[in-house]
């Protein structure tokens, strides 16, 4: 159809489609940990163009943005904002695996908290950290969660909302509108056996998954994938 449209610009105007379908297109879906970049803009234009073509052919199209708001990267976002908010590191010493963009400082300045941190508390927070960059940020995340749970929750929620609002505004200016913003957190936790993600996992494990080396693997190679994929790591 694209070849026909390329050769004849009026192709879609004259095309009649008798097999109309409901089609969902999930695109952009950048992690809500910072502003969109040019690559995301390209994906937005591409996905929206596909949606418009399918709509012109008579299909019912739903555009979805999948918001990964439940992963480790969101913890790193919250940790980065916390460290900036309370000036735990100098500019040159800021953790390598933390987010360092100017937007982190903007969020830190914008959020209002009813707690403060003393100099000795800051020193304790950043004392004796691992040398490995990933272990260092994970240790900071764990310490902040344990010692400042209320501030952590407020910063995490505020930072996530701030970034998502910025993404929405940029996409609106780009004239790309999504029918649905699906939040990964709505699936619940694996620790909750009644959650949607636990129910889905149980169905998959019944017929299309297996355990190996302490991890749960999806038999995706049976469905055209080049290899099986890990669902739950050990």
Each model region followed by its residue ranges:
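NTP-dependent nucleotidyl-transfer catalytic core
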Residues: 1-234
